[in-house]
Amino acid sequence: MKLLIVEDEKKTGEYLTKGLTEAGFVVDLADNGLNGYHLAMTGDYDLIILDIMLPDVNGWDIVRMLRSANKGMPILLLTALGTIEHRVKGLELGADDYLVKPFAFAELLARVRTLLRRGAAVIIESQFQVADLMVDLVSRKVTRSGTRITLTSKEFTLLEFFLRHQGEVLPRSLIASQVWDMNFDSDTNAIDVAVKRLRGKIDNDFEPKLIQTVRGVGYMLEVPDGQ
């Protein structure tokens, strides 16, 4: 597995490179945003570890540009910016995980391995595949086991949000803010109703079931173990 680290702090970059190399990865290190973006665009990386506060080009812009260019490798943001607003922004832009400095290397390594295991979701330019679910973001075509599925505009947006964060627990509040652009009202069941309708189209007549309920929190899209 080949990783790219984009980190301008020399000691942190060297520490990450040494630890991940010893863990069996091939590692490239870029010490500024411009070089990191160039390597990410031209190299064949399985995962990127990306700082946000970088010289030349910041991490926010790198995530945005990579996703706009249909680069689908997992991105782990590693940064000192630790507010909820920063975390939500990173996920909204298309990052797959977010870890705040200072960090424990064991946790970072576990997160890297988890992201790499999420190979069940394959992004090929504008296409997602999870199990037998196929989604084309450009044509907005959705099929499961070869059967065409018709979604409303909002159902498609909700499904796309699940796909971009496959394997992550998504709280109802985050779904509300990112898919409906509204604050979550705990007295309404709007999110649950929308998810139920989406399940009715992509899960009810198929196996395995992909949208999982995380009781008391929200939802997660993943292929169940053993499937």
Swiss-Prot record:
The lineage of its organism: Bacteria, Pseudomonadati, Pseudomonadota, Gammaproteobacteria, Enterobacterales. GO terms for cellular component: cytosol; protein-DNA complex. The cus system plays an important role in copper tolerance under anaerobic growth and, under extreme copper stress, in aerobic growth. HprSR and CusSR form a unique regulation system, where both two-component systems recognize and regulate the same set of genes, but under different environmental conditions. HprSR plays a role in H(2)O(2) response regulation, while CusSR plays a role in Cu(2+) response regulation. Under low protein concentrations, the two regulators recognize and transcribe both hiuH and cusC promoters, albeit at different efficiency, apparently in a collaborative fashion. It comes from Escherichia coli (strain K12). It comes from the Bacteria. Residues 2-116 form the Response regulatory domain. Pfam families: Response_reg, Trans_reg_C. The modification 4-aspartylphosphate is found at D51. Member of the two-component regulatory system CusS/CusR involved in response to copper and silver. Activates the expression of cusCFBA, hiuH and plasmid pRJ1004 gene pcoE in response to increasing levels of copper or silver ions. Can also increase the basal-level expression of copper resistance gene operon pcoABCD. Phosphorylated by CusS. This is Transcriptional regulatory protein CusR.
